Every structure is written in structure tokens, then in C-alpha cells.
Amino acid sequence: MILTKEQQAILDGEKGEVLAQIMKTLVRYGELFGADSMVPVTSKYNHLVTSFGLKMMTPVFELMQKLIDEGVMSEQKFSVDPRPVDKNVPANFLQNLIFNKIMYSKQESYEEQLKALGLMDEDAFTCACYLEEMGNKPAKGEVLSWAESSAVVYANSVLGARCNRNSGIMDIMGSILGYVPYFGLLTDEGRKATWVVKVETTKKPDAQLLGSAIGMKVMEDVPYVKGLDKWLGGELDEAAC
């Protein structure tokens, strides 16, 4: 991979061991997918996929704490996927025991880590960060470092932003450094459809069934779906949604 002088300096450890390790991880990630360079993340905010404090996710919590201890901050404020349990919904003793004390016993401490690293605010927990009320709607052409599957699809297909389906933790690494590997849906060539899918149903198709059927067929390729305008129109409005 060809790096800029600044990126190479980070990789060489000139800005500390932690940032060097993050750059090394992103370089390896990019090389696995054939990236030959890194590009700047250009969106105002990021969005993280890992929002739940499962006790078994110790490596994640340890990594987050190491970033905090080293004074590493995300270059962007970020929203994050929903909490696993809505604390505003009443729960009985057994539910509290199972969910809050056993399954998600690290939830409170993990949320404190998220705040320390750059969480937008107390209400920034959502799968749909691009909604107007959330304030995290990227513009067309902006390069993102997101991981949440549905948000990545929406950002690419509806908003025209550019983002690969990154993994959890990889999302915040791109946000910390301000760079992501240049491959896949970030490139003009990678955004070109390799499948044409014609929808010829006699009634509006179920979104989950249609999406699953297309996904199982095209896998990692890019589909161009025709025929949905019959049911959804050509504008993204309440009728379409």
C-alpha cells in the first residue's frame, strides 16, 4: 500500500505506539481487499455498531480503555447503535437480573467509555443515524467509516455517500486516524452494478423477503434494482417509506 508521508509517519510510530497499531490494522485490512492507498474520512460524524456491554466482550472493553488511557480521541463525534435494553421500559426482578446483571453487566461502564471517546450525546443510540432528528446525515460523496449494515446500505444507495460495510471497532479506528482504506464502495468502479434485478411482482413486495432474496443471489456484488418505482415512486417520501 502506498502511504502519504503523514500516514507513513504514523505507521512508523512517530505519533505513538497506539496510533501506529491502529494504522497497521487499517493497512492490513485494506491490503486484504486490494486497497493501494488510504483516503480521508470526510463526514462530520461517525456511527459505531458496537453498542452493547456483553460481559464476554472483554477484548473490546480493554481496547477502548487503552485508547482512553493513552488520550486517543475520535476525530469525529459519533452516534452508536441502540442500547440492548431500554432503561425507560419497566422490567421485573428476573429481567433486571438476566439482562442488567448477567448478560449486559458491562453496559454502564461501556457507555462511559463511549462518552470518553466521542459519543455525540446521551440520546445518540440508534440504527437510523441518518434521520433528521439524529443529526448524523452524511452528504452525497462523503467518505464514511461506518459499520452498521442497514445504515451503510442507506448511506450508499439513498444518500450517495461512500462507505464499505466495515466491521465493529474498525469503524472507530477509521474515525480516530481520519483515514480508511480505498477499495470497494469507496471507488467509482466498485460502485458500478454487476447485476440487474427486475421486480415484476403483482403487488408491493415485502422488503425483508425481497432484500434477502437479492442478497442471497448477488452476495458481495452490487445490484441495480428496477421496477420498485411502480410501488414506491421515484422520490424518498412518506409514501415510499
Language-model-derived ranges and their functions:
Residues M1-C241:
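Non-transmembrane, aqueous-exposed alpha-helical and coiled segments at domain scale
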